[in-house]
A protein has these predicted regions:
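Accessory cap/linker subdomain of secreted extracellular hydrolases
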Residues: 27, 56, 69-75, 81, ...
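Conserved alpha/beta-hydrolase "acid-adjacent" motif
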Residues: 254-259
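Conserved small/polar residues in nucleotide/adenosyl-binding loops
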Residues: 326-333
Length: 343
């Protein structure tokens, strides 16, 4: 698309509780922002993706100033020119953000909230922030919504987590990846051979593997509040005043549909404006036909191909963000139809 915007890098400083160890109390969040080419004095809303995959040596991704090929490029080309800013934000312990990868714990949550406030309070911002992302990046919107931040107007979680333990323990069973999710999957994030690597030695980084192993063995929180700290939905229902556009593949074998249903019913019951887009795809965005075909099989969604591909999804997103970020939120419709509860 035409280069109608410029991307710049910023650090957001915030105070970390000293008990978080690592880099506390001096938290620092790394982000990049693209602002559309608009007349001087015009303010615009912000669409932001928060996650661990920007500028991260562990997964060999480019600098955060380059839009992510998985989502950022599409937003820059198809939505930003309509008068939206876009931001990519590294969660704590990843990319150029300091501290440690505490896997969605308190430090990460506080960093997410600080970045939302920063994005909503800049001179070029109209004060409204929307968050979007898939998988890990679809879990950070739930984290942000816990705080009731006045700038957070809408979130679009795509196959995101309402809680970390809820991902891997369900109906009396434990997934094989459960004991190693913290340091086995994300343990190398933020470790790149510089002097800031010492900041990764925060308490939760050390406790995480033992807590995962204990829950795998006994099925519950054996000690402490590691899992309670990483359950988001209860605080969202209590504090959030924005809207939710919830997206979920019903053949997602990574983040199962129980993250979306009956979650959407609980949003309705809490009088939170919500919309759901659920389809017969795997751990994907709704408009990616090649991935949908490659990740499906007979009996696992391929029967619905290509009818389940939503090539109108970016247009749908544009209309959603325009309505929610540029105008006052519509009255909450208490007559929303309910989805059936999951088994």
């Amino acid at each position: 698309g035409a280069q109608l915007w410029s991307g710049t890098h910023h650090f957001v400083d915030f105070e970390l509780p000293i008990e978080e160890g690592g880099a506390a109390p001096n938290g620092k969040v790394s982000l990049a922002v693209w602002i559309p080419d608009v007349p001087e004095g015009t303010t615009v809303p912000v669409i932001a993706e928060f996650g661990p995959y920007f500028d991260e040596a562990s997964v060999e991704t480019p600098g955060i100033e380059e839009p992510g090929t998985w989502l950022g490029t599409m937003i820059l080309e198809q939505i930003v020119p309509h008068g939206f800013a876009f931001a990519q934000v590294s969660v704590m312990g990843t990319g150029r953000s300091n501290h440690c990868m505490d896997l969605m714990g308190t430090a990460e949550q506080l960093g997410v909230d600080a970045a939302v406030t920063w994005l909503g309070s800049q001179d070029w911002s109209n004060g409204n922030v929307g968050m979007i992302g898939k998988s890990y990046d679809g879990s950070t919107p739930w984290q942000a919504a816990m705080f009731g931040n006045e700038h957070l107007t809408t979130i679009v979680p795509i196959s995101g987590l309402i809680g970390v333990m809820e991902l891997m323990w369900r109906n009396g069973s434990s997934e094989a990846r459960a004991p190693i999710m913290h340091n086995g999957v994300y343990g190398s994030y933020g470790i790149d051979g510089d002097l800031e690597d010492a900041g990764n030695m925060c308490p939760d980084y050390l406790v995480g593997p033992a807590t995962g192993g204990a829950a795998w063995a006994w099925g519950s929180e054996a000690a402490g509040d590691y899992w309670g700290e990483r359950y988001f939905l209860d605080r969202v229902l209590e504090n959030y005043e924005g809207s939710v556009y919830l997206i979920q593949g019903m053949h997602d074998w990574n983040v199962d549909p129980h993250m979306a249903i009956p979650t959407i019913n609980r949003l309705y019951d809490a009088d939170i404006e919500a919309k759901g887009l659920f389809g017969q795809w795997d751990h994907d965005y709704p408009d990616r036909p090649q991935q949908m075909y490659d990740r499906s099989a007979d009996g696992r969604g391929r029967e619905a191909f290509p009818e389940m591909v939503r090539m109108d999804w970016m247009q749908d997103l544009l209309e959603w963000f325009t309505c929610l970020l540029y105008t006052s939120p519509s009255p909450r419709d208490k007559r929303q139809s309910r989805m059936p509860s999951s088994a």
